[in-house]
Amino acid sequence: MAGLLSKERSIAPADYNRWRVPVASVAIHLCIGSVYAWSIYNPPLTRVYGVVTSAADDWSLSAVVWVFTVAIVSLGLAAAFAGKWLEEAGPRKVGVVAACCWGGGYIVGAAGILTHQLWLLYLGYGVIGGVGLGMGYVSPVSTLIRWFPDRRGMATGMAIMGFGGGAMIGTPLKEFFIRTFYQAPEYLGAATDVNLVTEAGRRFAEVSGTLREVVVVGATEVRDMTVPGPEGVYVCLLYTSDAADE
């Protein structure tokens, strides 16, 4: 593997068609440019527990919106330091590390969502993923410029076009996957038909003899649901058992 990623192995033969390089470079930048579609994640992240609307223990919008900022700052810092390493190691090695960081950042961030640990989301998507963004940004740009010394402006423009276009492609893709894998929580009925108990700022309803935390969706919240559903009472995806057992 080390030999395959070495700088020497990335030297193309003399008859290589240089117009293949922009295609790969733009594709890479389209992928990492999807970071600009981060805002699609904000609403679902504020209702991880409630799913249809925010529950008492869900993250606030102000708590999750800064993940994007951390990712962009990490991008800039990584790009600044990756340039020198790129000259020494070559684009293949830098590109593979970038892919591992970008993909690994998603995995760590997903673990943070699953365990409801906000710091893991910041570490994964913000820091690790951001480092992957930075290294993934400089590698195609540097390679393009080397292949097009006579058209440096055009080469840089193609790479930036891909990075900027990432949001255009990433936004509908992310919306599609969010809707595809969306699972509506259990619906208990209209708020007037369910016996609700409020404790410590949380709402509970008796389900099969057990108090379970619920959220109440009104006309305003219905408009913000990932997939439209009826107004009423929904069981939280995860609920605080300690409060329910009191």
Give the residues covered by each predicted segment.
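Central cavity-lining transmembrane alpha-helices of secondary-active solute carriers
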Residues: 66-83
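C-terminal ends and interior cores of transmembrane alpha-helices
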Residues: 101-114
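A gly/Pro-rich, aromatic-decorated transmembrane alpha-helix motif that marks the paired
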Residues: 161-187
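Conserved MFS/SLC helix-loop-helix module at the cytosolic interface between two early adjacent transmembrane helices
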Residues: 79-99
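Intracellular juxtamembrane helix-capping segments at the cytosolic ends
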Residues: 45, 135-148
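Cytosolic juxtamembrane N-terminal segment immediately preceding the first transmembrane helix
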Residues: 2-27
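Hydrophobic core of transmembrane alpha-helices in multi-pass small-molecule transporters
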Residues: 118-134
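Conserved small/polar residues in nucleotide/adenosyl-binding loops
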Residues: 239-244
